[in-house]
């Protein structure tokens, strides 16, 4: 069937098989047959013609023959088999392949192979205007083997964050991240009024009721997760983080990123935050810091790009080394904006020129802050981009 033609992206097993066949110049041609040709399947079928002894004129070439219309209807279908190729149909395909010639789209009527139209039922309501079908054609094209290859580039864009320690962000820290967030919020709503200061998060006398709610509303949770959810340590840790966030908010005061003013420069905010944490006398471990930052930040396409690190090398904006505020830096990548581009292969042009010219003409005009991820390289030729 047709899946071997396109199944699997660049670098996958299927793609590597196709790549080997084409690079070893083993493929002479592919013939597209009509649908409904076989008993058990009605899907499109393709014949691959392989040879390790190509004629000189076929070297580096692949012939594609469109024979999808070369068939007639059977009087009685056999399962999914409804179409049948006649001797003249088969002869046309074999002769076209044998002659290794290009045939522009030609109607079957011109070729003397027009089939008898299938009789439509006259029962029921008929449309006011008859539907005109496009004439059925036959064609053959010849391509270079390299025309079927491409280099898959990974295109990155910078993470842009706004930050503000709002009351809402602080309140959200009472609950752990997924998968605990929604269950904790639901249990807090149900049982918080019954907890005292020294019994906060204690489910020892409420476990049966809590489990009933979890089973009814959060059936996807595993037993281990339920045990963690009903452990007071989790609740106390989250409350402690929330209280730390309140202290940090107070220390930030009226500065950008505090309660009253949003910061659209996360790089500057990190410096401000570091000072506020020190002044508040609190400490955040790595896990707490991540949850805190996630709670107070939102993606904003108009914010400054987030700097990942300062580089000592020269600027190469096409590959992610940007001049920014007097330094050469690498930005954090925004995974949600990551994209891929398939660049057609061209053996007459070096790989670097090929991908750079493509990037500058097809990508930069649309997203001027993008760059090519140079870490994504082909395993065979070690060039940027994965060949497919």
Question: What role is predicted for each listed range?
Answer:
Residues 2-388:
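A conserved structural/catalytic subdomain of Rossmann-like adenosyl-cofactor enzymes
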